[in-house]
Amino acid sequence: MKRVISALAAVFVFAALFFGIMIPAGLPAHAQTDELYIYNWADYIDPETINDFEQYYYEQTGKNLNVVYSTFDTNEVMLTQVMNNDERMDLLCPSEYAIERLVRNNMLMELDKTKLHNISNIDQRIYDKVDAVFDDIVINNTQIALSDYFVPYMWGTLGILYNAQIVREEDIEAGYGILWNKADNKKLDKKIFLKDSIRDTYVAAVLYLKEIDALPKGLEDKSVQQLINTVNDTMLEAVENALVEQKPFLKGYEVDYGKNEIVANKAYVGLSWSGDAVQAMEENEDLNYFVPEVGGNVWFDGWVIPKNAPNPEIAHMFIDYFCRPEVAIRNAIYIGYTCGLDREVLRGSAETVAILEEYEYDIDEYFNNEFRYPEIDQEQYGVMKDFGAMHEKAVAMWERVKAKGSKTWILFVIIGGVAVMGGGIAAFIAVKNNKGRRRAKVMVNNADVENNEKTD
């Protein structure tokens, strides 16, 4: 299914967004206008759900609402902004380890779950997993449950997206080694993407070292959960050496355009989040995804409210709205990821089923898809924790890795950036709807157009 916006309409919309022209939203101009400031990953929400919430807010309160939506491309960028109080924020959507750091720094408000009437729709397994991992947070001699500070938004796994027409069985058997082209597939040279994200890349490198029996001494018998959260000088050195070794096979580091390059057959392998992989597989039937046998990372992104949020009441209302099955599923379809609601709650909602059928999904296939709904209780999946006191050393290691061959890398970034900018402008002209996934880059309430997607 495709929907094409007329060129004239597109020019008007682009001009309105670019120059800040106000487009009437159909709400009474005389009503009081409240504001809600949201800081989220780019391309990580359906803009129509923002508009719907503004309308819902008016119906509930009799007041207009202006959602001011801005974006970040990594947890580290978000954390810097929050720690420096550089942004006015009511709602953030960090990953679990970033939530941990914010909680430890006493920067988040404990949620008032009496105001979250739909909280029972959340998949309890997520809270159980998170609280089991983050069981050592103590503030003022009181143990803190991370689940008291966030509501799950999206979740998934970290694995490998690949082109099955190019990748051979021996490449897959290499596990994370495929990112290092261990099976010596000449077609993969300079056709492999790695995430421009220290946390995701660190996980891949650590588990690759485990695959090839190259872990530092004494770590051989540790679980995946323990390994991906082992950050010391010895492990950092081993990871750095492995990542430098990988660079000759690399097409680039990315957080947004790699998936599109693989869909377009311009690259053949990439470290990928499961949601991006599902999107890509729907667009190119030659693509597939797997989590290597050695194990992987299961991640969770969630809504949190900063302690200094100017509008916490509206923030609670927004979180609760996104815990409604029909809202959650339509938003999940748009961005391609798995929402934090219990799948049985979703499956049991007639409205949710109708929405999935509207977008031509098979209901059983959707909810039984192992990429959307992996068994997160398995020991093969670890959850990332904050680097803690080793954060600066880890970041320095990552910068050294990226600096290797920097002249070539800078040129690649410039070329990639121009391509991304071109893609962002083109998105105003045509909106692609693939099984209901409208992948437009849309500016919401005069927020800047950005083309970055989820990363750690």
Residue ranges and their predicted role:
Residues 19-32, 427-434:
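Sec-dependent signal peptide cleavage junction
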Residues 31-105, 409:
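Early extracytoplasmic/lumenal segment of secretory-pathway proteins
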Residues 44-47, 103-261, 266:
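Extracytoplasmic ligand-binding site segments that recognize negatively charged/polar headgroups
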Residues 89-94, 251-252, 268-273, 288-289:
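Paired acidic/hydrophobic, glycine-rich loop segments that form the ligand-binding mouth/hinge
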Residues 98-101, 269-286:
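A ligand-binding cleft/hinge motif common to bilobed small-molecule-binding domains
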Residues 119-121, 240-244, 283-307:
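Periplasmic-binding protein-like
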Residues 297, 306-379:
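Mature extracytoplasmic/periplasmic domains
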Residues 368-455:
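Conserved C-terminal helix/tail region of periplasmic/extracytoplasmic solute-binding proteins
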